[in-house]
Amino acid sequence: MITGLDHIVLAVRDVAQTVAFYHERLGFEAEVDTDGKWTLHLGAQKINLQNVKNLPAIAKNTLPGTANFCVLTSEDTFGLAHRLREAGIAVLKGPVERIGATGQIMSVYFNDPDGNLVEIARPV
């Protein structure tokens, strides 16, 4: 039986640029492991960053900019949208009401440096 989500992997063109975007501009916790791979931590889950030039054979069809995911925040999404715009991040949509895994959420959508669609949502 499937019990939850452990991690996702993003194939990226420039790991340093991606780490800077998520860590410095969005506040994600970032760390490098012993193999030199970067991880973004989100509570009990994580996002692994994999340079597209060094993808393992099992992930050879993974392309930068094709992911679409939602992370949760406790921050007011109207304030978040304003903060993103002030940081030079183009807000594509939102705040807008959606249905999340556990109920109503208010979401803000934007792209990361590789073009992945990032949704940050706050439960209503």
Question: Model-predicted segments: where are they?
Answer:
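N-terminal beta-strand motif that seeds the catalytic metal site of vicinal oxygen chelate
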Residues: 1-17, 67-69, 123-124
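Loop/turn position at the start of each blade in beta-propeller repeats
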Residues: 3, 35, 103-105
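Core segments of cupin and vicinal oxygen chelate
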Residues: 11-53
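Short, conserved charged micro-motifs
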Residues: 17-18, 76-81
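Short beta-strand micro-motifs in enzyme catalytic cores
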Residues: 38, 67, 104-108
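Short, charge-rich, low-complexity interaction segments located
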Residues: 54-60
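Vicinal oxygen chelate
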Residues: 82-124
